[in-house]
UniProtKB/Swiss-Prot annotation:
This is Ditrans,polycis-undecaprenyl-diphosphate synthase ((2E,6E)-farnesyl-diphosphate specific). Binds 2 magnesium ions per subunit. It comes from Legionella pneumophila subsp. pneumophila (strain Philadelphia 1 / ATCC 33152 / DSM 7513). It catalyses: 8 isopentenyl diphosphate + (2E,6E)-farnesyl diphosphate = di-trans,octa-cis-undecaprenyl diphosphate + 8 diphosphate. Pfam families: Prenyltransf. GO terms for cellular component: cytosol.
């Protein structure tokens, strides 16, 4: 493919439950099927040498779902980490986790830390799994850290700018997304990367996440390649 490619893609993997319900299956079966799509898109990113992929796996609002579904999602996440970590490492994938880890189980937190430590030197792809995250939480938490840094005398008030503030976000060290993808027909970003998506190209598709395959990913990349990214400026033709 000769057209330009995004270097950081952020994905809201929506529609697992609706996919299952449309087939007369329990919602949890949709979450299981969604893992296959995760693997497909990771492989696509490796093939196309895309440097960073962020997957919104669990939002801070998802705790309001039925307890049985939340528990299943946490167990599925833990099981997938244990099962896939060696393969991810062998393919040169660096795992990172964005979000508030404190409410997660100690077992899951340890597995996440171990995965980050094991893959920290890998350079083929950054796989950023976003868990228990909300964009408002990220900004408020960053503001608190920034205020504490100023009060401690480590930073002057007049030194604060956008670049400095971004260093206190949970995504510090990662580039801002070039392309945002949301599946299942919802036309919103749902409190995901509110700061980071300021100039990101948005792509929405009606396809449920378990049906989002290599072809659907290619369509998103083609759409991105047709965009004129202006970052608040005007194009040369205007």
């Amino acid at each position: 493919m000769n057209h330009k490619l995004p270097q950081h893609i952020a994905v809201v993997m929506d529609g697992n439950g609706r996919w299952a319900e449309s087939r007369g299956l329990p919602r949890v079966e949709g979450h299981k099927a969604g893992l296959d799509s995760v693997k497909k898109i990771i492989n696509c990113c490796l093939e196309k040498k895309i440097s960073c992929l962020s997957l919104f796996a669990f939002s801070s609002e998802n705790w309001s779902r039925p307890v049985t579904e939340v528990n299943f999602l946490m167990e599925l996440f833990l099981e997938a980490l244990r099962k896939e970590i060696d393969d991810l490492n062998q393919h040169g994938i660096r795992l990172k986790f964005t979000g508030d880890r404190e409410p997660l189980s100690q077992i899951l937190q340890k597995q996440m830390c171990d995965a980050e430590a094991l893959t920290k030197n890998n350079q083929q792809l950054i796989l950023n799994v976003v868990v228990n995250y909300g964009g408002k939480w990220d900004i408020v938490t960053a503001a608190r850290k920034l205020i504490r840094t100023v009060l401690d005398g480590k930073l002057a008030y007049d030194e604060i700018n956008e670049a400095v503030f971004a260093q206190f976000l949970d995504t510090n060290g990662m580039p801002e997304p070039d392309l945002f993808i949301r599946t299942s027909g919802e036309l919103r970003i749902s409190n995901f990367f509110l700061w980071q998506l300021a100039y990101t190209e948005l792509y929405f598709t009606d396809v449920h996440w378990p049906d989002f395959n290599e072809h659907e990913f290619e369509l998103a990349l083609i759409s991105f390649a047709k965009r004129a990214r202006r970052f608040g400026q005007i194009s040369q033709s205007e």
